[in-house]
A protein has these predicted regions:
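SDR active-site strand-loop-helix element
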Residues: 10, 36, 79
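Conserved glycine-rich Rossmann-like NAD(P)H-binding loop of the short-chain dehydrogenase/reductase
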Residues: 25-42
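Acidic helix N-cap motif at the loop->helix transition within catalytic regions
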Residues: 44-46
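Conserved Rossmann-fold cofactor-binding substructure of NAD(P)-dependent oxidoreductases
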Residues: 48-52, 57-78
Length: 80
């Protein structure tokens, strides 16, 4: 189901995202995982763990910002 899918994870730098991202990459081989978070420092720290994986992308934003969220959702198959 998630194989070759594009997945957006809101609050992706939190505890759920830190567990979900590596497990999903390994188990389901998605086309892309977008980590959507408003915390730039946490994104920078998390990016170091996935620097060799081109499937992982980071998107700065807040779910309360409708326009930013709309841009992040472009081409997304699943939202977590």
């Amino acid at each position: 189901m998630l194989e070759n899918a594009t997945i957006l994870i809101t609050g992706g730098t939190g505890s759920l995202g830190r567990k979900f991202v590596p497990m999903t990459l390994k188990k389901y081989n998605p086309k892309k995982v977008i980590i959507f978070s408003r915390d730039e420092m946490k994104q920078w720290e998390m990016a170091k763990s996935f620097s060799d994986d081109p499937r992982v992308r980071f998107f700065i934003g807040d779910v309360r910002d409708k326009d930013r969220l709309h841009r992040a959702l472009a081409g997304v198959d699943y939202v977590v």
